[in-house]
Every structure is written in C-alpha cells, then in structure tokens.
Amino acid sequence: TGERMAVVGPNGAGKSTLFKVIAGLMKPDNGKVSVFGAEPSGHICISYLPQHSHVDWHFPVTVSDVVLMGRTGKIGYLRWASAKDREIVKYALNTVGLGSFSGRQISQLSGGQQQRMFIARALAQEADLMLMDEPVTGLDTPSQEELFTVLDSLKSEKVTVMFALHDLKLAASSFDRVMLLNHRLVGIGKPQDVFTKEQLKAAYGDRIQILEADHDIAVVDDTCCGEVEE
C-alpha cells in the first residue's frame, strides 16, 4: 500500500521480537501472525533489515553482491543471475542513489549508505513489506534526511514500511501511523491519537516525565541522564 508505520516503545519493549515474528524468523508463543491476510511464509514477500550492530560489515562482499541477494528467491540457490536480475539490481541501486557504489566493499560505506543499500536489496527482492529495525541509530541528520528521501520514493513502489525507532517527534512527523509497544500493543493509529499522556505513561511507566508545549509532547527519561525523546 505504500504506508509507513513507526514502531516505538522503550528499550526491551519487544520491537525487534515483533519484527522477527512477522518475518517468520521466530514463532509466536501463541496465536498466529497474518501479513496482508496471509502467513509470513506464504506468498507475501518480506524484507527484514536488522539492527546495524547485527551485521558483519567486514565480510568481503560488494554493494552489488548484497543487493543481488534480494533476487535469491527468484533465482534459486544453484542458478546464475540473469541479465534481467542484474538490470533489476542496477535499477534498485540507482533508485537509492548508489548506482556508482556497486563495486565497493560494504565496509567502505557510511552508515546512511549502508541503510540505503539494504533498501535497494528490498527493492531487488520486490518486497511487499519492509521491516527496518532502528535504521537511524547512529546516523547524523543529513544521513537521516537522505534515508527518508529514499523511503519517500518507496510510496510509488507500493512498499509498506514498518520502522522501529525511539524518536517520538520523528515518528509523529514522518509516518502515516504509529504502533506503541511495551510487551503488548498499547496503541496503534495516527500519531496524534496514539501519543496521548495516558498511553505514553502506559508504555514508558513512572520512570519518565511528560512535558507538553505548543501541541508537542516531550518524553524525558529520568533513568538515562536527561536523555530526551520527543
């Protein structure tokens, strides 16, 4: 559908676990998972982008190699990539602005470029749903802006994006809907409907203070030396 949903909540709330269950990498303890009306292992194509720290950035592969991995489901494991597959990889890299980086080792990329590479892989995969686990962590403001410019282009590709993050102000300003978690679903819907004092208290508990001014809400975490999430 091209929708963009932010998944927010305190550390340990279950954001990464939720993504792994949706991607079919973990089984739910009970109940079942349905993605666009189908099981994750069904015909729905899901791309999962793990947290930056979970990737071996010194593994000797090029940017093009990683993006081509997105074609594995179409090619199979024992066949060579066709000219069509390589054209799709080229298109995906150009779409995210990495066309001239195809031959570079992944260790040579900046943090923002690494995230754009994974988006290119999802495009090559022809994913219906993209799960991005805290992709803006460690990125400077220009890199974050580049990432969201690329995500804007995915709307025309009809790719739905679920995006785990901690910045509530960014979630409110840059996403169609938000999901607020803390070991359970606290709220889901438009940011202005979910980010209420009551629901933020339910998610973050007594360890935070909630400040309101000019229709903005600031969440101040008393346990993290004044760290602020807006």
Regions found by a protein language model. Give the residues of each.
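Conserved ABC ATPase "signature" region
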Residues: 68, 83-101
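ABC ATPase nucleotide-binding domains
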Residues: 196-198, 202-230
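Helix-to-loop junction immediately C-terminal to a conserved catalytic motif
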Residues: 23
